Amino acid sequence: MQPTRNESTTKRPPVRREPLDRSSSDAVIHDGTAYIAAQVPDDGLATVAEQTQSVLDKLDAVLARCGTSKRKLLTATVYCADSRHFDEVNTRWDAWVPWHDPPGCQYVVAKLRKREHKISIQVAAAI
């Protein structure tokens, strides 16, 4: 005989979305994890270092809205339009991420949505 499932064991945690616009969310929170959409810089004409700092500042803000911080990062994916930018991006990243709480991180060369964007970062964090 199959055991019956009671209501409390079959309920799933709610999904919370931090809206960005109609087609995407800045973050989706589920089961104690915040999945942050890839953030892009505000100024596409800025230097790589400035674009990176802009993205890191945006990540701080989105993480705070989700009730977490960079200290609880689980993973990070850094997208660069050109592999020659990795060293400059990594300098800013290393200054920003807590050295004693680093996430699993990967760097990817990718064509970004807007040609002037040189950097984009996507993260997931524990709540």
Please give the residue ranges for each predicted region:
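N-terminal presequence-like segments and the immediate start of the first folded domain
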Residues: 1-74, 80-127
